[in-house]
Amino acid sequence: MREVRRAQGLSQGDLAGGDLSPSYVSLVENGRRIPSAKIARSIAERLGTTVEALSAAEEPGARLSERLGLVGQLVAARASQLAGDWAAARRQLEAVVERAGGADQDEVRWEAHWELATVLGRLDDPARHEAALRRLLDDPLTRTAPVLHARVAIELAQLLRTEGRLPEGVRFAEEAVRVTADLEPGRPERAQARMALLSASVDSGEWSRAEQLGAELRAEAAPLPAGELRAGALWAVAGAQYLAGHPDEALELLTEAEDQLATTDGVRLRLRLARARTLLALAAGPADEAEALLTRARQATALVGTPASRTWLAVLETAAALRHNDGPAAAEHAAKIDLTAGDLSPLDRARCLLHLARAHRADHHEETAEADFKLAAEGYEQAGAFRLALETWRELTAGTRRAEGTDPHAVLMP
């Protein structure tokens, strides 16, 4: 049925109508619904064929051969990913998605779609990445499998958060938490969903719920083995603890999170976690710990000298100079912040502007500082980080930072 429809250039929506919905057409094509004789005749008439022709089965050997061919292409695409050839992986996965049309090929098609979404993310194509995830979210197989549903919703929540669309990110993270509620304890998806929700909630300014979400995430992370997921969970809980007024515990959690990553290959995650720990230590940690972490950040940047890493080091150096009330040094370091660095999310860009504003104010360039504060606040607002925007406006109006209490701009979430 699917092959006949596609051969005629029809969509499932084109075939639907009257007694048929597009979702029902999809279920029939996937072998998940057996139509009545009346509906089968209706479908055949719309396709200009007969029920007998639609019911003709392929030879089992041909179906098996086709499936094995698709699996082989999927394996080749995975090899391309391991080799870092993302463009080749994309072509191979798109071919699998196009060919996997049989009812017995649902799982292969889903895996290809999922991996294609991942590859599009690595190719820095957020629009197509999002479109691929939304297609997966509407896939009948996704909707009938809570684990698959959760994985897609989590990935979509993280993408939207990175793209500066925090309210949507929170919504999909909440959806992920909801669909994982019935999964058995210890499933990684349960912790992943709660980590996505906590991170998006903190970034968007829903700090009143952060401590409770952190407690739930900590309980979910307890049975997890050492590794990236457990590290990410501890990191997220640390952010909630700091905002709740427990900076010492937050720093201890970040230290534990770094220990969890010691034997993993997640270089990008380790670098960002190190930045988060250093920035928080500069805001609330002992002077010797903050200085040691800053020294390590300098060493890491010397090894990984990307525009983004150099910009983050400039932010950290600026924060350190501000901690020592050294306005000229803060301004000198802030001048090295590159707001065009490609890896900066909208939220991170606003955070960079906030540090620029503080440096200019400390160096007595009030007009420049005011302009930077306004740009930072607007950047936060556009991303949906309304609480951070409000804190920025307050700091601009007050003419100085609060001497006591937490600095929410110092919280980097996973």
Locate each region found by the language model:
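DNA major-groove recognition helix of helix-turn-helix/homeodomain DNA-binding modules
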Residues: 36-53, 399
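Amphipathic alpha-helical segments of tetratricopeptide repeats
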Residues: 59, 94-101, 134-142, 174-185, ...
